[in-house]
Amino acid sequence: MSSWFQTPLGEYLIAWEQARFDTMLADIFGYNALQVGLGQVDLLRASRMPLHVCTARTARDDAGSAPSRLTVACDEAALPFAGASLDLVVLAHQLEFSATPHQLLREAARVLVSEGSVVICGFNPYSLWRFCRYTRNRWPWRGRYLSAPKVRDWLTVLGFEVQSSQYGCYVPAVESPEWLGRWKWLDHVGRRCWPVCGAVWILHGIKRVYGARLIQPNWREKRAPARSLPAVARKLGEAGALPDKVSRKETCKS
């Protein structure tokens, strides 16, 4: 995977995605951000959150990660984080190469707080790059590409509200830098004429928890209930206090 992103086509793809991630993540606020996948690229660099964490399956995958963030070796389908503990989760080309993409999305929903954000990028099955899947037997052409509308439906079922979606990279999947430059004009034309045919897509969703109510802590100390009088005192009050008052009134009248 990391070697492909060092090719001219991979660098072209990462440059487009990095620019979109920088714009999206700069306006998402919180404390804890998690990037799942593409550890060799710091997609969280524009995030203002103080804690950046990236997942890696093995120590070899961790070797190329950015030094400014923490790295956790784990299975993406079973994230080692408590529920409602993260404010941002980035899934970078993970759904199309995961054996359980639904479980991966459920994990993202579990670890996110209410109003937390998930940003997902994936390859578009309806672009010109789809033909490479039949002629090239290596990453990233071996994945099971998912369309943006399908992932949007999955997010809706999990309680997310999709805020925005973008398509990009309309140049054919050529490996030559010279030919990439010649086809560069398709990026401008593709955005205007056939926007949903870009090679990649990016979705931004927000986790909604409808009916949630904030409960403020009760900092006031509860007062102890007043102690009731003993039964003997109550009987004396009922039997002896009233006659005493009556006798005093009668004494005053006399």
What kind of feature is each model-predicted range?
Residues 77-89:
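A short acidic, Gly/Pro-enriched loop at the edge of an enzyme's catalytic core
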